[in-house]
Amino acid sequence: MSSGANITYASRKRRKPVQKTVKPIPAEGIKSNPSKRHRDRLNTELDRLASLLPFPQDVINKLDKLSVLRLSVSYLRAKSFFDVALKSTPADRNGGQDQCRAQIRDWQDLQEGEFLLQALNGFVLVVTADALVFYASSTIQDYLGFQQSDVIHQSVYELIHTEDRAEFQRQLHWALNPSQCTDSAQGVDEAHGPPQTAVYYTPDQLPPENASFMERCFRCRLRCLLDNSSGFLAMNFQGRLKYLHGQNKKGKDGALLPPQLALFAIATPLQPPSILEIRTKNFIFRTKHKLDFTPSGCDAKGQLILGYTEVELCTRGSGYQFIHAADMLHCAESHIRMIKTGESGMTVFRLLAKHSRWRWVQSNARLIYRNGRPDYIIATQRPLTDEEGREHLQKRSMSLPFMFATGEAVLYEISSPFSPIMDPLPIRAKSNTSRKDWAPQSTPSKDSFHPSSLMSALIQQDESIYLCPPSSPAPLDSHFLMGSVSKCGSWQDSFAAAGSEAALKHEQIGHAQDVNLALSGGPSELFPDNKNNDLYSIMRNLGIDFEDIRSMQNEEFFRTDSTATGEVDFKDIDITDEILTYVQDSLNNSTLLNSACQQQPVTQHLSCMLQERLQLEQQQQQQLQQPPTQALEPQQQLCQMECPQQDLGQRHTQINGSFASWNPTPPVSFNCPQQELKHYHLFSSLQGTAQEFPYKPEVDGMPYTQNFAPCNQPLLPEHSKSVQLDFPGRDFEPSLHPTTSNLDFVSCLQVPENQSHGINSQSAMVSPQTYYAGAMSMYQCQPGPQHTPVDQTQYSSEIPGSQAFLSKVQSRGVFNETYPSDLSSIGHAAQTTGHLHHLAEARPLPDITPGGFL
């Protein structure tokens, strides 16, 4: 790699074209220099050749002789390529009517191609295998700042960063391995051009053109004249290698070479443009001026953006008539800098468009020399958005002693050099006659100043261009409202007064009204017929009338009077704490406020739970004498209180009850350790106590726990297409004690005839509570004495006692449950923290979902 001092990049070249004038033919008999005649003929042919190039005249005037020859060769090569690629024959271009139609079609295609280039976020680039720019679209100037004529048929390595040249050369090779060129990277860096020895391939050595590995997508940095930070712009190249037809190149032996591969790619900026930049990126226009900045020409884009024709633009006089008064001195400073140095630098100002609209532009003007002397000015303008223009206006250094827009300029010894609209005090006289008498005294005539002076250009401007509302008045209104609101009150006052639209409107304009009243001396000095008042225009845009000002004054008076009398205004009350407290309480109680699903108040639920806790603690000593049904009634009620209501959309048929009326033969108590309950996530509220649940009346002690966590799961899962229910009747015996519980067991469990069980119609299903089917699907049981088996009885819908249950079941779903017939008895086990175990012969109940409380 060579040192950085020897690396050069492409730059803008300032050329001084030779004056092209037709010299008279010398008279006969007068001797002339043969070499001079040869040079004259050569210059004449070059001028004629340059006029045939498809470039604007201002570009052609800057071309030197070598550039004319280079661009001519490039144009002929491009034409040969399209002749072969489009398969156009000379016969297609012959004939009168056919030729006319072909010209119209070509013109339409040309217009469509221009529109496609403008819509494209990037430019088109074609690079040959020897790294020459075969073609570059004209939009390359919008991204890199180079003219199309500056890069065509030049080495592409002059535009590429030194660190990316090797990668670009690798992408040009069809196999991504340019190993044929020795020290190619070093040769590229030092020579800034293609390798000295080019390698040509025959079609047999190259893959098909439509092969997938001929596609290319890579990134590299290109030289950018528009970027003042680094001078390079990261671009993404996406395209493919294709054959470049019609070049008719010859080898060293004179043989015609076959078409070679070239990179056809679209280069787009790596950083996508913002939404605001998309609208203005393709509207760079150029204007031509005299040395005093008088317009003398404008391109088509400038006429489209500004709305003027070239005649309207060039017959107005000084170009400062199209510049905003606040930007005149700023542009004059750049104008002087351009006369001294040849280039003005980036200048941001406002240009006057047609229909009295101001457009922010970023301009760069430079001098064009002819015969060693400045001839004219070429200015390149790029439109900006209003937001960008205001940002540049804020960043502009206030080194100038004054601005025209503020009324502080005292350039000439006159009383007031401004027109009435430029008067810093916008308050006018009341009568029209006094205004007419005053205007001639303060407005100087056009003949008072030099025609090319800034004051003359300012006076020649129409007053209406400063009265016309801007295209986007939202920023002005937002700043105006923000300033007024900040001075009128805090956000609490605005929040309290948000219910009244009129009060809010008065608050927003309070500061502006105070300023207006201070200038005028009172509301009587403000008249709606004063249309030239800037403040009145703003008030009119906001929908504010002078009656609103009087109402505002009355409101201020009454508010001041109430404050003086000691009355407390509701606006002065700080309700922030109350609002935050209410929101916090609402968030804390969000889990208890499911009003759509709950049927009992939260307070009633909590109070009943505490009351039941106290009652159950008092009854622990009396449980030995109580029947099991009476002991289970509070438990059933507590379960109803404890279980929260589920969503109404999840409706399952639930049966609330317990095995209160069933009695195995031996005394059995059921152990329910806390650790095991926590393991199964059934009783999350138990805190380190193991409780026993009674299953028969002979139990000596049967304490139970009051704090139960809800286990909201259905008793029986829903099944389809069957109404048959099989319940196990084995290992269960009827109770020896008469049942007194309000919850009898389901009548479908058929038992001996001496006792019948049915559904209690009075038991309200308050909540979709769940139920343990004997607690046999979750807990394993210790073996105990054998019980008298009861034959399994099948449920039938024909039994009268079961019609109530069947109607309830069929209203929610159809069940088809078959319980295993072998059920072991439950033995009494000591209170322990260990796990319970099933019998080896006991089968689990996978289809029964455990739920509820015992």
From Swiss-Prot:
Region (Required for maintaining the overall integrity of the AHR:ARNT heterodimer and its transcriptional activity), start-end ranges: 49-81, 116-124, 264-266
Region (DNA-binding) residue spans: 37-65
Positions of the PAC domain: 346-387
Record PTM: Mono-ADP-ribosylated, leading to inhibit transcription activator activity of AHR.
One GO MF term: sequence-specific double-stranded DNA binding
Region described as Disordered: spans on this chain: 1-38, 432-452
GO term, biological process aspect, one: cellular response to 2,3,7,8-tetrachlorodibenzodioxine
Residues spanned by motif Nuclear export signal: 63-71
PANTHER family per UniProt: ARYL HYDROCARBON RECEPTOR
Purpose of the protein: Ligand-activated transcription factor that enables cells to adapt to changing conditions by sensing compounds from the environment, diet, microbiome and cellular metabolism, and which plays important roles in development, immunity and cancer. Upon ligand binding, translocates into the nucleus, where it heterodimerizes with ARNT and induces transcription by binding to xenobiotic response elements (XRE). Regulates a variety of biological processes, including angiogenesis, hematopoiesis, drug and lipid metabolism, cell motility and immune modulation.
Name of this chain's protein: Aryl hydrocarbon receptor
Species lineage: Eukaryota, Metazoa, Chordata, Craniata, Vertebrata
Gene name of this polypeptide: Ahr
